């Protein structure tokens, strides 16, 4: 199954955190392409936070979507992610953005990612590695990104 995963971090050494997360992701997916790393300002936060480093990767997995989500949460925990408030600073954040174009609305997972369409820090790196990318239910990634600018 083709999967698009967004990565982000703004605590500790964010670039190193992303690189370590990518290595751990190789345990559960075959990574085909990884975007450049992008430095972005925190999105929709009330407190002062450091800038984020963000990236997107595309890969293949044999796992089902919910099992892959469990693996991502486990990787986050192993890399020191502490969950507190929404949009809090974080050592690592891993999100499934798209999973083979599936639409899933379960207790533990919503696909496609419900806020990806409004997040330039997801759309820009995704467009870099897949210029024809489509976000199921929302349209072409290049058009979604253009609408944000």
Which residues does each PLM region occupy?
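Extracellular and analogous surface-interaction loops
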Residues: 60
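Short, solvent-exposed beta-strand edge segments and adjacent coil->beta transition regions
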Residues: 2, 52-54
